[in-house]
Amino acid sequence: MKMYAQRALVLLSLLSFATVSLALSSCTTLDLEHIKKKRVEAIRGQILSKLRLTSPPESVGPAHVPYQILALYNSTRELLEEMEEEKEESCSQENTESEYYAKEIHKFDMIQGLPEHNELGICPKGVTSNVFRFNVSSAEKNSTNLFRAEFRVLRVPNPSSKRSEQRIELFQILRPDEHIAKQRYLSGRNVQTRGSPEWLSFDVTDTVREWLLHRESNLGLEISIHCPCHTFQPNGDILENLHEVLEIKFKGIDSEDDYGRGDLGRLKKQKDLHNPHLILMMLPPHRLESPTLGGQRKKRALDTNYCFRNLEENCCVRPLYIELPTDLGWKWVHEPKGYFANFCSGPCPYLRSADTTHSTVLGLYNTLNPEASASPCCVPQDLEPLTILYYVGRTPKVEQLSNMVVKSCKCS
């Protein structure tokens, strides 16, 4: 009994002391050059591992990459940035085996023509929607490896628009049936009709997966105005038979030739890289043999917004730019030439910076047992993907590498 009382007094004294003088983490503080060297080696191993390569490709590809391939790379990079922003806003985090390995990026441009049996002539007067068709049959053999699919369309300003904003809704077109609807609602949002051009992105993973498994279900997508068969007065009263016109214009759709709802119109430029398209992220089967699903919640940590603006001495994310040709000695990666990989550094004071009660108890335990396990260290918490462009022989590859950019840190 006396022994337990003595231990309790020791713990209480340690708690009192910690509130006045914070003990620092025992993790060794490294100089920048040593950190950069270790980080470079880690990145080298990460990239090869995520691509399932044992060594860098010998072929470096052509000296000049075609514009179409660069456009796909840029479009993918922009899409991933949007996805990371959405993930941050929803406070969600995915940490699965499928997240780890690199994804092959495939782009499918909109094609002309309407599918059979999907005449959606509910509102014959005025243009109330646009239909978008895609041929994704080349990806059917890898249908089970679809990781994500995004529908992207470029909104362009409409100077003659009568309203500054309009609500649009995205639908999957279904085969007509007396007992089911002709459309399946996917998403909706308010969009500006004027202003600078902007890309609109919609998650259509489930829809595209259905198309890949059942080709006959691929009847296209439709963007329609909300409540297309009537419009509204300023006070909210409904005006029947006064059809609201879709005033939002999209790049690649010749609106002047649209005369009826569901009329696709014609493509202004068939090869225009800004036309509506799908981006499919596919996980090659040889990179994932036994996929698992999972997820967890996360909380905000010491991120770049805070650490890059403040002279924080404790645990924080630090900027570190890696030049792939110079630091890695690689010429086979065409884009990017370099990127901010960043790293975590700084001491972890007990009781204040630790992110869990477990870390506090661990600190006290280590004080009583100095030869036991190490104290909390400054480690990455949030990481973002990196898009790369490289060649395998003469074939260009645009792929997404997960967890390559450190965005925030924590003590753990």
Curated annotation (Swiss-Prot):
Keywords: Cleavage on pair of basic residues, Disulfide bond, Extracellular matrix, Glycoprotein, Growth factor, Mitogen, Secreted, Signal. Belongs to the TGF-beta family. Latency-associated peptide: Homodimer; disulfide-linked. Latency-associated peptide: Interacts with Transforming growth factor beta-3 (TGF-beta-3) chain; interaction is non-covalent and maintains (TGF-beta-3) in a latent state. Latency-associated peptide: Interacts (via cell attachment site) with integrins, leading to release of the active TGF-beta-3. Transforming growth factor beta-3: Homodimer; disulfide-linked. Transforming growth factor beta-3: Interacts with TGF-beta receptors (TGFBR1 and TGFBR2), leading to signal transduction. It comes from the Eukaryota. A motif (Cell attachment site) lies at residues 261-263. This is Transforming growth factor beta-3 proprotein. Disulfide bonds join C307-C316, C315-C378, C344-C409, C348-C411. Residues 1-23 form the signal peptide. Transmembrane segments: none annotated. InterPro entries: Cystine-knot_cytokine (IPR029034), TGF-b_C (IPR001839), TGF-b_propeptide (IPR001111), TGF-beta (IPR016319), TGF-beta-rel (IPR015615), TGFB3 (IPR015618), TGFb_CS (IPR017948). Transforming growth factor beta-3 proprotein: Precursor of the Latency-associated peptide (LAP) and Transforming growth factor beta-3 (TGF-beta-3) chains, which constitute the regulatory and active subunit of TGF-beta-3, respectively. Transforming growth factor beta-3: Multifunctional protein that regulates embryogenesis and cell differentiation and is required in various processes such as secondary palate development. Activation into mature form follows different steps: following cleavage of the proprotein in the Golgi apparatus, Latency-associated peptide (LAP) and Transforming growth factor beta-3 (TGF-beta-3) chains remain non-covalently linked rendering TGF-beta-3 inactive during storage in extracellular matrix. One of its GO terms (biological process) is positive regulation of cell division. One of its GO terms (molecular function) is transforming growth factor beta binding. One of its GO terms (cellular component) is extracellular matrix. Transforming growth factor beta-3 proprotein: The precursor proprotein is cleaved in the Golgi apparatus to form Transforming growth factor beta-3 (TGF-beta-3) and Latency-associated peptide (LAP) chains, which remain non-covalently linked, rendering TGF-beta-3 inactive. CDD domains: TGF_beta_TGFB3 (cd19386). Pfam families: TGF_beta, TGFb_propeptide. The lineage of its organism: Eukaryota, Metazoa, Chordata, Craniata, Vertebrata. Glycans are attached at N74, N135, N142.
